[in-house]
């Protein structure tokens, strides 16, 4: 028989057949009444009759089962004082977690964050005293019964490392877990009803493939190669009976105790006592009643794979010489259901074969030693059991039911794994578990808020993609939470409890009727619309409609009836089109309104953004201008300083040149004449320069005198300040006398220079010329001394003026307080402003501004009071006296 993928026939389901598709309400999104495009292809392989559906609760929904199991403490843990009462079972459904003193939750509670006690509700809680058999009978047994009736179930364990997950799934040789007990229950319940030959093999997610005799032989050899622990397929050329005999003598033995005392996995042959115990275990008469037709047969196939570091590996891969394992791909079929490509499905005839294949897969699984478990599984392992329901001779497409048991890897802190592969494994495990939590949270959010459906991130992890079919309607799921009561793992246990609390709030949607209306329903509806009299007949004979609806033969209808059906369908189609058009118009209006609102919001945001950018740019450029001003000020100050230094250097060079000229005087009358002429010209030039400076000094003195006179006129102090004014006037008169003396001395200096010039013209002797120059130098020195004395006198006058101005301001302030006149308030403000510069030292601006290089300063036009002018005059620095004659 050629290999081929079976597709469902066209008339497999009747018009009124009810298709039960249990799924989370959150994923359904109120689309239960919408007819799917390819309904028959979706429901032909996996379908459930009306009698197989579960009874919903009172509100029409059924919550996801979440069971919790607490493992007992080990003697070593009791010695480490791990029993601090942090896990307390209050009743069969409520668990209380009390934070121990060294936990992070307790420290957060002491800082006022969070709480120390948390309570969680589960479907049922099992304490440490509950055995494997009791746990299986109270939880998984009903699910196995549903699988035998045609439903799909996913059972997965969740918990921290070393919490008993693997023990719950697989158990030990003496006390099996839910997986071996499920296998035993399935095979014990289906005794005598198993299909003898594996001519149908599961393919993709919910399809089957026909196998010919050669392919059946290859499947048997593959299974024997796995059961015999590494023999090549070429060596298995003996008959099936002999192979089965060899299979009964050889095998592997594995003790799974990962959750209690660390997983101890050994690939060795079982002893005779162990074989007897296993045979006795499979012979237990634990069955469930299965009411099936007499010609119905079952074919059971199993697969076993793991997800390690986000890579898929087949654990039932035949042995080969290659050291590197082949990775598998996760694909989707034409209906969008995920499946593992090239995954090995092994046909099993009894529970013993399935148990041995499980041990072979466990031998290939990834294990490693961690700080919590000496032999911890570092991957998510998924063991799937598919049951093909074969009707008759197997020519009809079978119905497929599946039971998947997933042993999730334990969540663990990455900081406990310092580096290397363990750190990478822990990171991938935590990432996949976190993605699973996000998917469950999104499903719960969609369930609570049906108007706003969020995207469920199934594709963010390989684990969630494998679970996607069970979360979106292809089956049901159940969570078993394993809790470690140790105080050192309380924070991780609290996180696990919070995760399971979200999962416990998910619900399954009730069965939804999917199918097309029958022809008779159209006929009945059209008849009622055509003749109202038929409505009475329909009411009087309700059984007639039921009999008509049960008929499925279209050939019994006449042409007129079929035309009526066509007319009714046209009317229904027109009505649906009008409804869809109305919905389209409504949606377009809503979308346009939303777009307009979004554009307005966008425009407002852009304007606000531009204003903000404008303010930021203004501040930025103001700062840049300030920095530029400071840099220019510092630059020009440095330039002025360099100029002063150059002037000093030139003066020093000039002094050295004069000394050298005096030391090396040439002999002869010509040299002396030339030298005298040169000195005369230099003296004449200096005389003109001094004369110009003298004129500038006169102008400056005149302006200063005028300013002092203005100050005297503007200052009209009270009578109490007259003694101070008299003293100031005396000192000013003395200063003016000194100025007059200075002027007379300057005139004498000019006359002496003129006489020296005339003497130089008549007397060519070098000695007389030197005497004239010495006389000029003496006169210049005296002039410098006079100027210095005058400057000191002016300084004293300024100090007295400061004191008197302060006294005048205080007296004015006192008078204004006493009189309270409004006309003097402005003058009081000016006095207060003029008092502030008294705190600053006077500036270094020279009094005789024309003698030194200076930059023009801007006078303040805001304050022109006499007090402000007096204060501005204080800022002029003291004039440094220097030898004018030596400079030139």
Swiss-Prot record:
GO cellular component: cytoplasm; Golgi apparatus; kinesin complex; microtubule; midbody; nucleus; spindle
Example GO BP: regulation of cytokinesis
PTM-bearing positions, type N-acetylserine: 2
Modified sites of kind Phosphoserine: 7, 14, 21, 527, 531, 667, 683, 823, 865, 876, 881
Source domain of life: Eukaryota
Post-translational modification: Phosphorylated by PLK1 at Ser-527 during mitosis, creating a docking site for PLK1 and recruiting PLK1 at central spindle.
CDD domains linked: KISc_KIF23_like, RBD_KIF20A
Main function: Mitotic kinesin required for chromosome passenger complex (CPC)-mediated cytokinesis. Following phosphorylation by PLK1, involved in recruitment of PLK1 to the central spindle. Interacts with guanosine triphosphate (GTP)-bound forms of RAB6A and RAB6B. May act as a motor required for the retrograde RAB6 regulated transport of Golgi membranes and associated vesicles along microtubules. Has a microtubule plus end-directed motility.
UniProt protein name: Kinesin-like protein KIF20A
């Amino acid at each position: 028989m050629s290999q081929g993928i079976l597709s469902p026939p066209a008339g497999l389901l009747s018009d009124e057949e009810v298709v039960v598709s249990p799924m989370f309400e959150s994923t359904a999104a109120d689309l239960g009444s919408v007819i799917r495009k390819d309904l028959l292809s979706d429901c032909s392989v996996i379908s459930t009759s009306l009698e197989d559906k579960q009874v919903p609760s009172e509100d029409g929904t059924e919550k996801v089962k979440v069971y919790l199991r607490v493992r007992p403490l080990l003697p070593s843990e009791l010695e480490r004082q791990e029993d601090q009462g942090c896990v307390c079972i209050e009743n069969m459904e409520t668990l209380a977690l009390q934070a121990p003193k060294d936990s992070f939750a307790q420290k957060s509670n002491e800082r006022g964050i969070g709480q120390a006690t948390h309570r969680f509700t589960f479907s049922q809680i099992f304490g440490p005293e509950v055995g494997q058999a009791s746990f299986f009978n109270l939880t998984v047994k009903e699910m196995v019964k549903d699988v035998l009736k045609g439903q799909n179930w996913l059972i997965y364990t969740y918990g921290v490392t070393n919490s008993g997950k693997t023990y719950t799934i697989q158990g030990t040789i003496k006390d099996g877990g839910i997986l071996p007990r499920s296998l035993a229950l399935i095979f014990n319940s289906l005794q005598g009803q198993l299909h003898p030959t594996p001519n149908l093999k599961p393919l993709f997610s919910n399809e089957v493939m026909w196998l010919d005799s050669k392919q059946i032989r290859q499947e048997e050899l593959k299974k024997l190669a796995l059961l015999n622990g590494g023999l090549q397929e070429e060596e298995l050329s003996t008959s099936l009976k002999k192979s089965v005999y060899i299979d009964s003598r050889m095998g592997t033995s594995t003790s799974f105790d990962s959750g209690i005392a660390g997983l101890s996995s050994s690939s060795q042959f079982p002893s005779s006592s162990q074989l007897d115990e296993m045979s006795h275990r499979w012979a237990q008469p634990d069955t469930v009643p299965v009411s099936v037709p007499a010609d119905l047969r079952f074919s059971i196939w199993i697969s076993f794979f793991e997800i390690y570091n986000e890579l898929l590996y087949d654990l039932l891969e035949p042995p080969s010489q290659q050291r590197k394992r082949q990775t598998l791909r996760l694909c989707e079929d034409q209906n969008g259901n995920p499946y593992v490509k090239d995954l090995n499905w092994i046909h099993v005839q009894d529970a013993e074969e399935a148990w041995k294949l499980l041990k072979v897969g466990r031998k290939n699984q990834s294990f490693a030693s961690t700080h919590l478990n000496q032999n911890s599984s570092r991957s998510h392992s998924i063991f799937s059991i598919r049951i093909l329901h074969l009707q008759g001779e197997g020519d009809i497409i079978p119905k497929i039911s599946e039971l998947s048991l997933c042993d999730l890897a334990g969540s663990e802190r990455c900081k406990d794994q310092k580096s290397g592969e363990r750190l990478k494994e822990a990171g991938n495990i935590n990432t996949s578990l976190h993605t699973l939590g996000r998917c469950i949270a999104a499903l719960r959010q969609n369930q609570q808020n049906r108007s706003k459906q969020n995207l469920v991130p199934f594709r963010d992890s390989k684990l969630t993609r494998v679970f996607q079919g069970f979360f979106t309607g292809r089956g049901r799921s159940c969570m078993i939470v394993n809790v470690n009561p140790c105080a050192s793992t309380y924070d991780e246990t609290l996180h696990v409890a919070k995760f399971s609390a979200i999962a416990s709030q998910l619900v399954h949607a009730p069965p939804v009727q999917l199918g097309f209306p029958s022809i008779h329903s159209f006929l009945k509806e059209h008849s009622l619309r055509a003749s109202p009299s038929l409505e009475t007949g329909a009411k009087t004979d309700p059984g007639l409609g039921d009999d008509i609806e049960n008929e499925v033969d279209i050939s019994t209808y006449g042409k007129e009836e079929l035309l009526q059906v066509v007319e009714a369908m046209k009317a229904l189609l027109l009505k649906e089109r009008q409804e869809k058009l109305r919905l389209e118009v409504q949606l377009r209006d809503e979308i346009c309104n939303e777009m307009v609102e979004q554009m307005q919001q966008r425009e407002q945001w852009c304007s606000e953004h531009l204003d903000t950018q404008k303010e930021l740019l203004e501040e930025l450029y103001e700062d840049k201008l300030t920095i530029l001003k400071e840099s220019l000020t510092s630059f020009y100050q440095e330039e002025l300083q360099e100029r002063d230094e150059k002037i000093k250097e030139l003066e020093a060079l000039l002094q050295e040149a004069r000394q050298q000229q005096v030391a090396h005087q040439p002999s002869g009358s010509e040299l002396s004449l030339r030298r005298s002429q040169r000195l005369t010209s230099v003296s004449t030039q200096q005389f003109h320069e001094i004369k110009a400076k003298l004129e500038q000094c006169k102008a400056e003195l005149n302006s200063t005198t005028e300013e002092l006179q203005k100050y005297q006129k503007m200052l009209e102090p009270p009578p109490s300040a007259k003694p101070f004014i008299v003293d100031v006037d005396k000192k000013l008169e003395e200063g003016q006398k000194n100025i007059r003396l200075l002027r007379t001395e300057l005139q004498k200096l000019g006359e002496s220079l003129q006489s020296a010039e005339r003497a130089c013209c008549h007397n060519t002797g070098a000695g007389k010329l030197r005497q004239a120059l010495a006389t000029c130098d003496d006169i210049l020195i005296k002039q410098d001394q006079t100027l210095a004395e005058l400057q000191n006198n002016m300084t004293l006058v300024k100090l007295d003026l400061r004191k008197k101005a302060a006294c005048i301001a205080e007296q004015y302030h006192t008078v204004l307080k006493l009189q309270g006149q409004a006309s003097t308030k402005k003058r009081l403000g000016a006095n207060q402003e003029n008092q502030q510069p008294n705190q600053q030292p006077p500036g270094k601006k020279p009094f005789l501004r024309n003698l030194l290089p200076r930059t023009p300063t801007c006078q303040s036009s805001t304050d022109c009071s006499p007090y402000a002018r007096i204060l501005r005059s204080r800022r002029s620095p003291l004039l440094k006296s220097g030898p004018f004659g030596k400079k030139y």
